[in-house]
Amino acid sequence: PIEGEREKTIVTACRLHPQKNLPMMINAFSMLADEFPEYKLVIYGQGVLEDELRAQIKSLNLEDRVLLPGFASNILEKVAPCSMFVSSSDFEGISNSMLEALGMGLPAVVTDCPVGGARMVIKSGKNGILVPVGDTQAMYEAMRSILKDPALADKLSQEAIKVRDEFPLWKIAKRWLEVL
């Protein structure tokens, strides 16, 4: 994990697609906005929902706090110093961006969605926090708990980084072959 204080940024990297349920993530962040005015949400990626998401961000008066910078070729450098990784997908296999964020020691809040890829990696409360699909309130509460409790954030970070050893590529491929 990164030593010292992280950037006051909550981050995700994904396609801007309905499957990712980004409106829920933005709504959960908006619930945090007043209590944590120093934080911003950065959503890296491109896709069909960009205009809709920008309209939502504008309607919530969060244009200076929720950023859609598009595609970043140096995404790992962008994500590494952030405070938290969030994924709000309605369904997902094993998310590469989630694995990369965990491997860099970012505390993560991720929906516990079918097919169950996140559940294969995250032990909720130990190395990340799983929340029910579509549950904005639960996502808000999980994000808030990490921001309010530096000891929890540090514990999640220390455990998250172990994903690098527990889930090398060959192990992930073997587990998927067992499922299929």
Q: Language-model features: where?
A:
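Short hydrophobic beta-strand element within catalytic cores of glycosyltransferases
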Residues: 107-112
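Aromatic "clamp/platform" in nucleotide-sugar-dependent glycosyltransferases that forms part
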Residues: 71, 90
